[in-house]
């Protein structure tokens, strides 16, 4: 199973780096040749992605980290189902005019929220040179496959309308 393979690979890499306790942030890509790590760091998950931890356990990420740091016991109430988050990728370069399809994306079964953080006039720059994600999509479903499918479907409903960025050179 994919989750077991990820857990095994993550355990090996974290151990090789000397990580023994505390939070670990991992970003990886599943490819035809296996698991490719993008980032592995001794830190918590960043930004709003940490909301998934509270969805899954009923306890905030900050509470878990602090309790672990001072060796205080805490109770996690594992919630049924699977939760997912998509950091919405920057679709193209340009100046944002509007985002269409937000209501349709929110209506996809399993979607908890669609949060767009950028506003009209924001300069969009795709990765790898790009800046922050334009927003996040959160899902909750019976299993991980359904949670991922809901995220992907909601993402297809979004359309970022942009204008070209016109650079002015003053001589």
Regions found by a protein language model. Give the residues of each.
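Active-site nucleotide/adenylate-binding loops and adjacent lid/helix of ATP-dependent enzymes
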Residues: 1-8, 12, 145, 152-157
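Peripheral (often C-terminal) accessory segments that flank ATP-dependent C-N-forming ligase machineries
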Residues: 66-171
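Conserved protein kinase catalytic/activation segment
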Residues: 34-36
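Active-site "cap" helix and flanking loop/linker of ATP-utilizing ligase/carboxylase catalytic domains
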Residues: 4-26, 32, 41-100
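Generic beta-structure capping elements
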Residues: 40-43, 117-119
């Amino acid at each position: 199973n994919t989750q077991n393979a990820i857990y095994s690979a993550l355990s090996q890499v974290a151990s090789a780096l000397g990580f023994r306790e505390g939070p670990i942030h991992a970003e990886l890509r599943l490819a035809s040749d296996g698991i490719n790590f993008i980032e592995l760091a001794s830190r918590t998950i960043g930004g709003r992605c940490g909301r998934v931890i509270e969805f899954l356990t009923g306890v905030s990420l900050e509470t878990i980290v602090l309790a672990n740091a001072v060796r205080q016991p805490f109770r996690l109430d594992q919630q049924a189902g699977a939760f997912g988050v998509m950091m919405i990728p920057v679709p193209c370069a340009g100046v944002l005019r509007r985002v269409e399809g937000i209501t349709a994306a929110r209506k996809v079964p399993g979607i908890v929220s669609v949060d767009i953080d950028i506003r009209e006039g924001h300069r969009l720059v795709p990765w790898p040179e790009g800046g922050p994600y334009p927003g996040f999509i959160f899902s909750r479903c019976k299993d991980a496959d359904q949670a991922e499918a809901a995220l992907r479907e909601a993402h297809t409903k979004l359309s970022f309308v942009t204008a070209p960025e016109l650079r002015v050179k003053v001589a």
